[in-house]
Amino acid sequence: MDKEVKAWLSDIERAISEIYQFLPDQNDFEAFQSDLKTKRAIERNIEIIGEAMNRILKVRPDFPIATARKIIDTRNRIIHGYDDVSDKIIWTIVVEYLSELQKEIERLQS
């Protein structure tokens, strides 16, 4: 695996780890929704994940991440359509999809 790709995978792994640090209780949507700092920190880390994934796909278009395109699209939506991203969308990404991405990243790094 390319050195750059390894670095971008590490960036994704670190961003996922930070998201889980910012949101230890994944059962309290109302607390998440009312905490602006946490929301922005998580959004920023999703942007980082999306940008790293975009860079990976530019050098390795066939890279085996099942949701790669959706991740990049979400990053673009947060950055360019920030007023169109609901708290529920961000919450759903973290609670329902992030752990699977984390497993994929760990598998690829081993």
Which positions does each model-derived feature cover?
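Solvent-exposed interaction patches of small proteins and small membrane subunits
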Residues: 1-110
